[in-house]
Regions:
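Alpha-helical transmembrane segments
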Residues: 49-75
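N-terminal secretory/membrane targeting signals
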Residues: 1-29
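Extracytoplasmic/periplasmic beta-strand context in beta-sandwich domains
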Residues: 203, 249-252, 316, 351, ...
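The canonical Cys-X-X-Cys-His
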Residues: 194, 238-239, 292-306, 344, ...
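Flexible coil segments in periplasmic/lumen-exposed cytochrome c-class electron-transfer proteins
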Residues: 269-289, 293, 297-298, 354-393
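Sequence/structural segment immediately N-terminal to covalent heme-attachment motifs in c-type
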Residues: 285-311, 319-346
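Non-transmembrane, membrane-proximal soluble domains of secreted or membrane proteins
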Residues: 29-52, 72-294
Length: 393
């Protein structure tokens, strides 16, 4: 009895020391005890199953450990009990003690837990039944591309948190690392079939309040679905380690009523049409430089760095680069292989340099090429017009 008392005393002291160290840090942290508020059927089912499992596990834990602790105290050697020699079930009671727990575990695993989990998984994978629209999500280092095939809308979404906040040069905002320049807009109450793929490495599209976390894998088209039940803005991020700026790939979804969604579609189409029309316009140097700076900061600075110094050997410097300041066209006016413009349009095989011809408009490519050739100490002085890019695609 004295040994048991000493053990309990030491355990209590150890637990007190651990709690004294941990509780202050928990008090200062934004700590969540449960899942975020679900806003889709998948998230709600997941939460309900989680709570159901926790109840079953808690009952099992209390029952099993209660019996164990009672047996250890009740049948201890100090009160005269002798150890039994157990060679296997021999009597009816011993057979019951062996078979009843086995039957209980089967019931718990296959009925209490298995049936609800089975139906939830089947529902999660039913992406096509009664789907109202399709959203295609393409992951790339380190941004997302969203496409609405039914509406002819396609655009990039990149993190908009200022780099000065990341470098601790200014105070961090409310949605630090969870804000983007172009959010996803979806209608409330509509089942959206989500198709996912990637252009480079594996990414994971994850929005906690949707209960959705699905890998985007190069060469594969994977599926999931969401049906948002409440208007609002929902934030997530890439949940798969995908390289240098993995932590800078947020996902922001704005759920709106259907009428507001249709108005957004019309507005987005108008903006995209205006951007396409920019290919036939002659841009001034100031216009190209201003637009190019914006494109560079969103699409290029993450690898080539804000001042064009790069991060060798993976991300070459643009400042003083012979490729950036070299010729773009041959004497016949054709695009030179491996030139600055060719690399931006078609990428560089075997490197992290991806092709931008399918993600940036003619005007954006012309602007960023002009900006890079006339910044970071590069003084090429020439201008690239969107019409030139259009003709060389």
């Amino acid at each position: 009895m004295k040994n048991l008392y000493r053990f309990c005393q030491r355990a209590a002291i150890s637990l007190s020391v651990v709690l004294a160290a941990v509780i202050p840090s928990l008090a200062s942290a934004d700590y969540r005890w449960n899942f975020p508020t679900p806003v889709t059927p998948i998230a709600r089912d997941t939460l309900e199953i989680h709570n159901h499992f926790m109840i079953v596990i808690t009952v099992l834990f209390v029952t099993v450990f209660g019996i164990m602790i009672f047996s250890m105290i009740k049948h201890r050697k100090s009160v005269g009990h002798q150890p039994a020699r157990f060679t296997g079930p021999t009597g009816t009671v011993q057979w019951l003690w062996a078979l009843v727990p086995f039957a209980i575990l089967l019931f718990i695993d296959y009925v209490l837990m298995g049936i609800p989990a089975y139906h939830a998984v089947i529902d999660m994978e039913d992406t096509r039944t009664k789907a109202d629209m399709v959203l295609k999500v393409t992951g790339m280092q380190w941004k997302w591309q969203y496409e609405y095939p039914d509406s002819g809308i396609k655009y990039l979404s990149t993190m908009s948190t200022p780099r000065d906040q990341i470098a601790n040069k200014e105070a961090k905002g409310e949605h630090y690392l969870l804000e983007v320049d172009n959010e996803v807009v979806l209608p409330v109450g509509k089942k959206v079939r989500v198709l996912l793929t990637s252009t480079d490495v594996i990414h994971t599209w994850w929005v906690p309040q949707f209960g959705v976390k699905r890998d985007a894998i190069p060469g594969f088209l994977r599926e999931t679905w969401v049906k948002i039940e409440q208007p609002g803005i929902y934030r997530g991020q890439c949940a798969e380690l995908c390289g240098k700026d993995h932590g800078f790939m947020p996902v922001v979804v704005r759920a709106v009523p259907e009428t507001e969604y249709l108005a957004w579609v019309d507005e987005k189409k108008t903006k995209l049409a205006a951007a396409a029309a920019g290919s036939d316009k002659t841009w001034s140097k100031d216009e190209l430089m201003a637009s190019g700076k914006d494109v560079y900061e969103k699409q290029c600075a993450v690898c080539h760095q804000p001042e064009g110094q790069g991060m060798a050997p993976a991300f070459p410097a643009l400042a003083g680069s012979k490729i950036v300041t070299g010729p773009l066209l041959s004497a016949e006016g054709k695009l030179l292989k491996d030139s600055h413009l060719d690399r931006v349009l078609n990428g560089k095989e075997g490197t992290a340099m991806q092709a931008f011809k399918d993600t940036l408009s003619d005007a954006e490519i012309a602007a960023v090429i002009t900006f890079e050739r006339n910044s970071f100490g590069n003084k090429k002085g020439d201008l690239i017009q969107p019409a030139q890019v259009k003709s060389l695609r």
